C-alpha cells in the first residue's frame, strides 16, 4: 500500500466509526437537555414540540443511554446501573419501524446501514425480526456497561392491548401520543421497577 492508500483507509475508517457511533457525537440542545434531566425527579415526562424539532432524536438518545449505560458528563437525569428492559412505541408497526427503530438502529431493511442509528453498532449484539412490516424488529439486544445485556422491544398502538401485557419494564418511550388504554397498560409494566415513562410528540 502507498502512503496515499494508507491515508484513504484511515479516513474511511474514521468516517465508518463516526457513522456507526452517532451517540458519541450527538450534541443535544438546551431544551433536550432539560427534558433528559427532568427524568431524575419524575416518573412520567413529556416533550411536546413541532414537527422536525428533534423529539424522536432525543427519545432515541435517552433509550440508548438507558440501554448502554453510557451517560454523558452533563447528564443529571435518571440512571440505571444495570441492563434495562424498555419499549420503544409508536402509532403503528410501520411508524415504529420508520421512526423509532430507524433512529436507534439505522434505515430498516438496509443491512449495510444497520448500526448507523443512535446505538453504537459495536454494542448491538442481537436482533429478533418482527412480524408484519418488512424490516421491522421485535427486539434488539444491547451491551450495557455493567457487562449485561439490555433489551429494547418495539410496540405499536395498533396492536391489541393484550400485546402490551405481562412484561416488567424499566422504561417506556412513547413516540407520538398513545391511546390512554395503551399508555395505562405501559405504566403498569413499570410499577415493579419504579420505572420511567417518557413521551415525545
Model regions and ranges:
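Phosphate/NTP-binding elements of NTP-utilizing enzymes
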Residues: 1-201
Amino acid at each position: 500500500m502507498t502512503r496515499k492508500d494508507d491515508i484513504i483507509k484511515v479516513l474511511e475508517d474514521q468516517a465508518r466509526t463516526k457513522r456507526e457511533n452517532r451517540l458519541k457525537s450527538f450534541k443535544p440542545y438546551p431544551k433536550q437537555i432539560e427534558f433528559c434531566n427532568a427524568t431524575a425527579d419524575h416518573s412520567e415526562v413529556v416533550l411536546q414540540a413541532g414537527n422536525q424539532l428533534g423529539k424522536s432524536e432525543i427519545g432515541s438518545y435517552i433509550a440508548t443511554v438507558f440501554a448502554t449505560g453510557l451517560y454523558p458528563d452533563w447528564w443529571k437525569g435518571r440512571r440505571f446501573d444495570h441492563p434495562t428492559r424498555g419499549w420503544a412505541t409508536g402509532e403503528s408497526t410501520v411508524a415504529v419501524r420508520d421512526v423509532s427503530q430507524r433512529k436507534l438502529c439505522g434505515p430498516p431493511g438496509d443491512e449495510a446501514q444497520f448500526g448507523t442509528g443512535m446505538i453504537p453498532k459495536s454494542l448491538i449484539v442481537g436482533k429478533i425480526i418482527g412480524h408484519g412490516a418488512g424490516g421491522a424488529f421485535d427486539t434488539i439486544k444491547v451491551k450495557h456497561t455493567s457487562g449485561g445485556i439490555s433489551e429494547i422491544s418495539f410496540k405499536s398502538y395498533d396492536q391489541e392491548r393484550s400485546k402490551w401485557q405481562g412484561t416488567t419494564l424499566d422504561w417506556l418511550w412513547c413516540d407520538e401520543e398513545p391511546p390512554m388504554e395503551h399508555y395505562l397498560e405501559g405504566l403498569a409494566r413499570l410499577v415493579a421497577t419504579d420505572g420511567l415513562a417518557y413521551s415525545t410528540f
